[in-house]
């Protein structure tokens, strides 16, 4: 799956999104697909997606929210949705990065979904802090760099099996169009 011509994420795999703008990054990636987006968030989480902010990225009617009551059900929901292969994007907000075995199960479920379902699903794990989910296909970090009259983000690919670390400046012009320009890695955020 490619977004904005340069952001490439292999389908039928699980990817980790981190940083203060990880929700916006998930919505940006969802905008590059068609069909429903399943967003899994813990029932005890204090915040929910705001429809007006969702509308900046995708049609809010595409969004389906699941709110499991138990922590172990978050990954179960994600795994089953990926295995079904009927939802192109499955997002899970997790309280902590999952270990290797559950991530491997997500990859296998997504591969099964791609072979049996109607689409090759994209699994997005949203982690707080710098993340650290073991075994993810890629790890991305996005943080806002807004200023007076400027809507911009710093986006990094921090880990990928088949690509080196890289950074971009993502910006939105006054007409709402997004542009992606190469950026230098900032030393204080590089790594992980």
Predicted regions and their residues:
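N-terminal regions of ATP-driven nucleic-acid and macromolecular assemblies
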Residues: 1-192
